[in-house]
Amino acid sequence: MPAIEFAVFPASEAFLKDEKVLYPAVDWVSKADGYIKSYYGIQSEDKKTLYLALFWDTYEHHKTLMESKEYAELIGLLKPSIGGKVDMQHVVFSDDATTVLTAPTTEIAIIKKKEGHSVESVKSAIHNLSTAVDKDNVSYVPSVYGPTVEDAETFLLAIGWDSVEAHTKAVETGADVKGLVGTLRSCTNISYVHVPFKVYSPVA
């Protein structure tokens, strides 16, 4: 599976007025060795946090770019879109994330292991929840998950939904899903957001 870079930061006022200010940066990175494709979107909850999801052949391809002297040029191109601190994480998901990122909205959950629990127990709980969600939420299977490169005890889970409301309803009305969410919360700390991603098309 590809390595996916998630870069998350407050969007600048310039981006919120015109998302095209981001295009020069993504167009530049789209020519980098190992780049596959990218998606971007504003978080539904706060209407101002920008999420970039860039697919790479491997994590090492992006690492090589970040360590190159050309990387400063990319940062310069990104600056007009950035309105605050940038948080970056990398993950190799359990399956192809294309379907969940092209859903009308994507749930991005950050799941951190609690003290006293094993990574394997967390992974098992996430797998069971993911499997249960996919049985009912068939339009956007498979949901995907994986540990971050930066911290093996932190997992990202991505699920595609028709809407934020559809996600809420699935948890409230699905007995299996509700129980499995409870099991996962017993061994982890979970935070999540929803992002309607768009695929980036290189400028002609």
Regions found by a protein language model. Name each.
Residues 1-204:
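Short S/T/G/P-rich N-terminal loop/turn motif that feeds into the first structured element of a domain
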